[in-house]
């Protein structure tokens, strides 16, 4: 009799990594990456604004405060997904939305809250100029190209279990399919003359085959593909025939038939078909 830890170690010593396969990104939740994923692009691709506000040259805002705003001339506006055609020069500003590329000449973004835009709108003044209420520093509210993921860098490591956040990363890299480890096929076989399939009427003295469904659900829960072999009756020929149906599976789980009773034939059949590495485990219940 061996411990649970020893049993797991022995079982895992027979385990090999399964072959990779490509899976559509939308179907990859819970799958395991088969290889490292490298980025072909910068994320973000260009320097862009982290705030809604005004793209400016920081030195144009020197000394700005709520009591002494710096007035800049507005020369354009740019939204996310577009490139500004104008160039920011000293004393000018471009109204910019979050995610929009930083216009040429700008080195800072002053958020709307640090301008007098709302005051000007309330006074129904045309937005040809803007008052800056706080001095900016170079790089303020700018996300640099490649700040999140740089081109050529590893974005995700092999062996990563894909969660929604990793799927989002892969989508941001333009990956519509990903290399993942094939899901193991796990054959599930219940044994016993007392068992009845849940689709059948229940005769006196019999019980429904519940273990198969519980085990299959566990297989699915942990990423496997259950293959239901049904019920094998308590005789060697029937059990051998059922076990042979699992030859194309990666793993076989049997339920019952492993004690020392006259009808417990699983051990004998397995010994005839292969090698029994261990049999009893020190655990309760067991």
Language-model-detected regions and their locations in the chain:
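Short, glycine/charged-enriched hinge/interface segments at domain edges or termini
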Residues: 2, 55-228
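Flexible glycine/proline-rich
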Residues: 2, 18-30, 34-35, 48, ...
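A glycine-rich phosphate-binding loop feature that marks nucleotide/adenosyl-phosphate handling sites
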Residues: 25-29, 186, 235
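Short, low-complexity N-terminal leaders and the immediately following helix N-cap/first helix
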Residues: 1-68, 95
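Short gly/pro/ser/thr-enriched loop/turn and capping motifs at secondary-structure boundaries
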Residues: 11, 109, 195, 260, ...
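Short glycine/threonine-rich loop/turn motifs
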Residues: 206, 212-214, 221-286
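Generic structural signal for well-ordered, non-membrane alpha-helical segments
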Residues: 1-4, 8, 21, 25, ...
